[in-house]
Amino acid sequence: MSVPSSLMKQPPIQSTAGAVPVRNEKGEISMEKVKVKRYVSGKRPDYAPMESSDEEDEEFQFIKKAKEQEAEPEEQEEDSSSDPRLRRLQNRISEDVEERLARHRKIVEPEVVGESDSEVEGDPWRMEREDSSEEEEEEIDEEEIERRRGMMRQRAQERKNEELEVMEVEDEGRSGEESESESEYEEYTDSEDEMEPRLKPVFIRKKDRVTVQEREAEALKQKELEQEAKHMAEERRKYTLKIVEEETKKELEENKRSLAALDALNTDDENDEEEYEAWKVRELKRIKRDREDREALEKEKAEIERMRNLTEEERRAELRANGKVITNKAVKGKYKFLQKYYHRGAFFMDEDEEVYKRDFSAPTLEDHFNKTILPKVMQVKNFGRSGRTKYTHLVDQDTTSFDSAWGQESAQNTKFFKQKAAGVRDVFERPSAKKRKTT
């Protein structure tokens, strides 16, 4: 493998860490150190633009690709730099890129901390060729730059003229139809889109225009709705008048019937003296009934006052001698084994009627049978049903719950039973109406 003479002449690089090949203004390549900045998550790099559009993103990617292509082996750089045609083409491409970027933004390149001690030197023959070709390149570049500047000025002037024409047309449209103007969002692309051919306007007759037809259809529809509303209002008015007329007829007919009924009454055969005598009898009965009720109430109050003035022994003797008369007193019957109990109730027992004097303790339905001969397991209520009982009766069953709080022998329970519990204290005094204060 042959090594180029230019590389042989270069002094050896002691360390290439952090060094990248950089091309200077003369087209020479040298290794320069760059300042490596620390990467911070979520922070924008220094070389990245603050704001960018789609066109700038594409240009930024193009610059990255161009830089990647520059970082090639030094052998290919030496071969390309020796050819003046390739060098002129590269310089022209780089100038185009720089000119395009200058119109948009400025690319921040990596900061150069320092340069290497030795730079790459070309051979004498290549240096002479470069000096001779630089003058030709400068002349070509000046002409090219002047031509491009003229084209850019012409393009800018054309764009400005078009914008003025569009603004004049929009101003005329706004003055003619201010009520129908609406805000629209328009998207403009590059100059190529603006230079597209415009369509020729076509005249449309007024009767064939869609907006006029829609306006006429809307007016016709509104007119139909108004006519329908008037028709509905007229129908409601007629219906209301009909209801009022019917109500008036009903009132007239009712008045006629009442007058006919009054005329049908025959008062010729009435006797005023008989009516007066009947009225006197009714009034006498009412007076007698009121007097009896008043005397019974006074008698009851006097009896209550007399019983209150009696002593305890006299009251007991009085009750034994004159027992309380109970209306519809029930006969205490004997219930059979597992017989169902029916409660007579306490309402309306003050009325003396035969139905309230029946024996409610008499057996009914299946209670007529003797259930003592049944097996022990069947001697329960509702046997074989969902409402059956657990025990036959609670006479031989101890249902005391010894785990309950009130069944425990504690100081708190003992104090409660001695002081507050009813039926467990040795007190046989008659309770008074007023509550005694306990200390």
UniProtKB/Swiss-Prot annotation:
Its main location: nucleus. Residues 71-81, 112-122, 131-144, 178-195 have a biased composition (Acidic residues). Residues 1-200 are annotated as: Disordered. GO terms for cellular component: centrosome; microfibril; nucleoplasm; nucleus; U2-type precatalytic spliceosome; U2-type spliceosomal complex. The modification Phosphoserine is found at residues 52-53, 94, 116, 118, 132-133, 361, 432. InterPro entries: MFAP1, MFAP1_C. The modification Phosphothreonine is found at residue 267. There is a cross-link at residues 67, 249, 357, 371, 381, 415, 418 (Glycyl lysine isopeptide (Lys-Gly) (interchain with G-Cter in SUMO2)). The modification N-acetylserine is found at residue 2. Residues 23-34, 61-70, 145-163 have a biased composition (Basic and acidic residues). Residues 1-17 have a biased composition (Polar residues). PANTHER family: MICROFIBRIL-ASSOCIATED PROTEIN. Component of the spliceosome B complex. Interacts with PRPF38A (via N-terminal interaction domain). Involved in pre-mRNA splicing as a component of the spliceosome. Belongs to the MFAP1 family. This is Microfibrillar-associated protein 1. The lineage of its organism: Eukaryota, Metazoa, Chordata, Craniata, Vertebrata. The gene is MFAP1.
